[in-house]
Amino acid sequence: MKLILTAEVEHLGAAGDTVEVKDGYGRNYLLPRGLAIVASRGAERQAEEIRRARESKVIRDIEHANELKTALEGLGDVTLSVNAAGDTGKLFGSVTAADVVNAIKKAGGPNLDKRTVQLAKAHIKSVGTHPVTVKLHTGVEAKVSLNVVAQ
């Protein structure tokens, strides 16, 4: 069955792509959920419009991501003060991605989604300087240095 995707489907394609799928997958999953339409001449023209709109949106998103990257890398070291720390420098909890986002915002950085923050480890559990990667878009990442200090 030949279909045109109307939304991004994992492991299949992006909106506007023409794909060949098994009949059952198309009829029972993609079409009822509105993720695809049956390929026809009129639908192919519509798919071309979807592709053009997606390309212009991707260009805008990449430009915005580069602006955010410049703003983040201009911050320098971001300091996060933690109350619960022991004498040995270990935290009585952990620093999560949400804590990092709040620290960046307090340092004058942009407002980010916590899902964009990637920590070197799952959670930071000690004081000191830790590298943090912020994935802003496909291929656009900003490196931020997070300094965790005990109060």
From Swiss-Prot:
Q: Does the keyword rRNA-binding apply?
A: yes
Pfam families, per database record: Ribosomal_L9_C (PF03948), Ribosomal_L9_N (PF01281)
Per the record, the GO terms for biological process are:
translation
Described function: Binds to the 23S rRNA.
Family to which the UniProt record says this protein belongs: Belongs to the bacterial ribosomal protein bL9 family.
Q: What else is known?
A: Binds 2-aminothiazole antibiotics, which are antitubercular agents.
| Protein name (Swiss-Prot/TrEMBL) | Large ribosomal subunit protein bL9
